[in-house]
Amino acid sequence: MRLLKTLRLASRDYTHEWQMSACFVLALAAVLGPMLVLFGLKFGVVGGMLNQLIENPENREIRPVSSGRFNQEWFDRMRQHDGVAFLVPRTRSIAATIELNSENSSRIVATELIPSGVGDPLLPADGALPDSITHIVLSQSAAEKLQVGAGDTIDGSATRRYGGRKERAHIDLRVVGVAPTAAFARDGAFADVRLVEALEDYRDGRAVPELGWTGVEDNGARSYPGFRLYASSIYAVSDLKDHLGELGIDVRTKAADIDLVMRMDRNLSAIYWAIAVIGLIGFSLSLGASLWANVDRKRKELSVL
């Protein structure tokens, strides 16, 4: 009962002195206005930039600047790093190519092979993966030139000069999917690492028994000149870059762009909270002083309640 009476008296007093009440509302709006503008800037513009950085896997890619010699033991150790989301070896660029042709097209498409596997950030998470030596995922450009789609079988071939004569080896490849244009804009094919290794071995004159390609037997330990590496998040790129630098591996990343956006986010957050705290304190002091003055002015009226 007392609460209802208090609310009734407060509402009547509020409407009776509507000019003073309107001033309180305007004061609150003056405090909230800049905060809302900064809130929109922080979570709109900067938030959109952060989301773009997070969603684009290219921003998480770490590329070696020059060729090196990386063995399987090195790859096994690097995969244990907390910041590594995806890591596969790369062969020499000149060896990672294959000529593709299909029955639906008269064109022979020279295609770059991209070593891939489970968790490849450039391929859709729910899409097909090249999980076999004869399975590939074509880029949109290559699929259009070959006029093929998922489920089709195409011919792949590679040439070499061996024993003083030119040879060409063929392999039937099954297209298990077509990658989006954003994944790879050129003529390319995502393939199992074993296929990329087999083509390098064939061109170097080594035998590939799994595919029936003859050559010199070589059972020595393999080393790779490069790798495909993606960090688990944009926040892990800088740490991975530093870690690789400690190992003497010079890499190229987009850490500078990531740091710029993150620094903008931190600065706007600091400004936002500083204005919020100062505005809240100022509004509280102003409101308190106004209420104190009103109570003092209405002391006689309040004393008879």
Language-model-detected regions and their locations in the chain:
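N-terminal Sec/SRP start-transfer signal
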Residues: 1-36
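Membrane-embedded alpha-helices of multi-pass transport/permease systems
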Residues: 22, 42, 281-302
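Alpha-helical transmembrane segments of integral membrane proteins
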Residues: 23-34, 269-289
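Alpha-helical transmembrane segments
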Residues: 32-59
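Membrane-proximal extracellular/periplasmic loop immediately following the first transmembrane helix
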Residues: 50-101, 107-110, 243
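The feature marks short, hydrophobic/small-residue-biased sequence motifs that occur predominantly
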Residues: 89-132, 190-198
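Basic-flanked hydrophobic alpha-helices used for secretion and membrane insertion
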Residues: 121-124, 137, 148-252
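Peri-transmembrane interface segments
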Residues: 233-282, 294-296, 304
